[in-house]
Swiss-Prot record:
Organism for this UniProt entry: Mus musculus
Molecular function, one GO term: identical protein binding
Coiled coil: 152-184, 210-243
Pfam family, one: MIEAP
Stored InterPro entries: MIEAP, MIEAP_C
Major subcellular location class: cytoplasm
Protein name listed in UniProt: Mitochondria-eating protein
Region (Interaction with YWHAG/14-3-3 protein gamma): 1-270
Any single biological process term in GO: mitochondrial protein catabolic process
Name of the encoding gene: Spata18
Induction conditions: By p53/TP53 and p63/TP63. Directly activated by p53/TP53.
Modification type Phosphoserine: residues: 13, 85, 123, 127, 154, 157, 283, 285, 508
Assembly description: Interacts (via coiled-coil domains) with BNIP3L (via BH3 domain). Interacts (via coiled-coil domains) with BNIP3 (via BH3 domain). Interacts with YWHAG/14-3-3 protein gamma; a protein that also plays a role in MALM.
Length: 537
């Protein structure tokens, strides 16, 4: 219906009809009778077309209303209208016929030539008025049939829609039942999984206290064993120190043999000691554990600076009692410092290996956690370092060093305190992250202003290092503290002497024999293997 109505609105038939009526009114007096009749017939034809379209729209509208709707409206309004129009048409026909009879009689005398045309138009109008009611009745019958068919079709479609709705409701109920069943099964599975997880967590929680208790028992047993071993070692060391004579009263050979036997016995005792085979866990010192790496580094740098400014000068004073040459004294102290760092680094490596062996059975974490535990243990147990053994190793290395030429009466045991302090500093520096170490130095190398400062008696224009007074302290490749070196132009080549395999056996006439550190019996030394002149210095 909407499409037919849109077509009627777009065709503008009613507006064209109104325009024609207006045009006919304006030209009615100037037109002839035939022209006016033609205008009237055209208007009737146009009205008939519009009426036919309206009847089609009426039929479609009635079909949309169904079998019951619109019937009363058609009966009440359309049928009476059609009846009145038919009766008015008939009455108008008689009146018009009478009027036409009188008018025809009057006009026949005037327009005898136009009478046949007028009769023909009149007969056409009469025939059209007679056929129009029959056409309207036929249209009504057709519209009734179409309305009945539309009603039957609508009832059928309504029944089909109701059946489809019922089927959809049944499907919806089945889907809801399936969804409820799935939800129940998923909830049951989740509850079972939660129960199993709760049971597993309970089991693990029950097992963890047992493991913790066993670990604590092992730890306690290890502590007891370590305390017993350390107390035994302490008593042995105290008895040994009480029985050992002063290092300056015996002969050099006796001291050397004693140091060798002592070192062998200590190495043997260390190898057989339970502390070396399986090191025990000690409770960390609270003060040392609280110290951060930065604080320990600052403290070690301060100790190293104090060793340069105070301990080095004290050692020089001790050596100057027996040696007049300042160059030899400074060389001895530099070599002692370098050897102390070397021996302390080796001792730190062995100590770290023992700690790893000790902590390996109780390690349950990753490698990083294990290394962290090893480092923390070493930091908290730096007092376990055997510095006296390192001092003996340093003195042995100095005795066979070919670069030191000095009177044989001077014993390097004079530098025991200095060497022990340097060994402790170097050992503690290896526990830092990153560790600190001294720079490599060799006689005759090019002077590096970033590593060393020149001594007061140096030639400040000389490019080569004559000898080193104090090593530079390094952190990776960065200089932390500068060392000290002596530079002299041309003095290095003039001072080169043949390398001596052993120290001289002749007595020194420089100092009296009653001075500290001078032996009454000459001491011979066995030849030592030739070392590289530039090794570690």
């Amino acid at each position: 219906m909407a499409e037919s109505l849109k077509k009627l609105a777009k065709s503008e038939s009613l507006q064209a009809l109104q325009d024609k009526v207006t045009y006919w009114v304006n030209d009615y007096n100037s037109n002839s009778c035939d022209q006016n009749l033609n205008y009237c017939i055209e208007l009737i034809e146009q009205v008939a077309k519009v009426q036919a379209q309206l009847f089609g729209i009426l039929t479609v509208t009635a079909q949309e209303g169904g079998n019951n709707e619109g019937v009363e409206t058609i009966k009440c309004r359309l049928l009476p209208l059609l009846q009145t129009s038919f009766s008015s048409v008939n009455m108008g026909k008689t009146a018009e016929s009478e009027m036409c009879a009188t008018q025809d009689f009057q006009l026949r005398s005037k327009n005898r030539d136009n009478s046949p045309d007028q009769d023909q138009h009149q007969s056409d109008n009469e025939s059209f008025s007679e056929t129009q009611p029959t056409q309207v009745q036929d249209d009504l019958a057709e519209s009734g049939k179409s309305l009945e068919g539309a009603k039957n079709g609508s009832t059928i479609s309504l029944l089909a829609a109701e059946e489809e709705i019922n089927q959809l409701k049944k499907q919806l109920k089945s889907l809801q039942a399936q969804e409820d069943a799935r939800h129940k099964t998923s909830e049951n599975r989740r509850s079972e999984a939660l129960k199993s997880d709760h049971r597993s967590t309970k089991r693990t929680q029950d097992q963890r206290p047992q493991d913790v208790v066993s670990n604590y028992e092992k730890h306690l047993q290890n502590l007891k064993e370590e305390i017993a071993v350390l107390s035994a070692e302490k008593s042995g060391l105290q008895g040994r120190s009480a029985r050992s004579p002063s290092p300056s009263t015996g002969t050099r050979s006796h001291r050397r043999g004693r140091s060798r036997s002592h070192s062998r016995s200590r190495s043997h005792s260390r190898s057989n000691s339970p502390c070396t085979t399986v090191a025990k866990i000690r409770s960390p010192s609270p003060n040392r554990a609280k110290m951060s790496s930065v604080a320990r580094k600052a403290a070690l740098l301060s100790r190293f600076s104090d060793a340069y400014s105070q301990a080095r000068l004290d050692a020089q004073c001790l050596l100057r009692r027996c040696i007049d040459r300042a160059e030899t004294v400074q060389r001895i102290i530099y070599i002692a410092t370098v050897e102390a760092f070397h021996v302390a680094k080796m001792a730190f490596r062995h100590f770290k290996i023992r700690v790893r062996k000790m902590l390996t059975p109780s390690n349950v974490g990753s490698n990083t956690d294990f290394e962290t535990a090893v480092s923390e243990y070493i930091v908290c147990h730096l007092d376990l370092y055997d510095s006296q053994s390192s001092v003996n190793d340093v003195i042995r290395a100095m005795n066979v060093n070919p670069k030191i030429s000095f009177p044989p009466e001077v014993d390097f045991c004079l530098l025991t305190d200095f060497i022990q302090e340097i060994c402790c500093i170097a050992f503690a520096m290896q526990s830092l992250e990153p560790p600190l170490d001294i720079a490599f130095g060799a006689d005759g190398e090019i002077f590096n202003d970033c590593k060393y400062r020149r001594s007061y008696d140096s030639d400040f224009t000389a490019p080569l290092v004559f000898y080193h007074v104090w090593p530079a302290l390094m952190e990776n490749d960065c200089v932390i503290m500068k060392g000290e070196a002596v530079t002299k132009r041309g003095a290095f080549w003039s001072s080169v002497r043949p390398v001596m395999r052993c120290r001289s056996r002749s007595l020194s006439p420089i100092c009296p024999r009653n001075h500290f550190g001078i032996s009454t019996v000459s001491r011979s030394r066995s030849p030592s293997p030739i070392r590289c002149t530039f090794a570690r210095y």
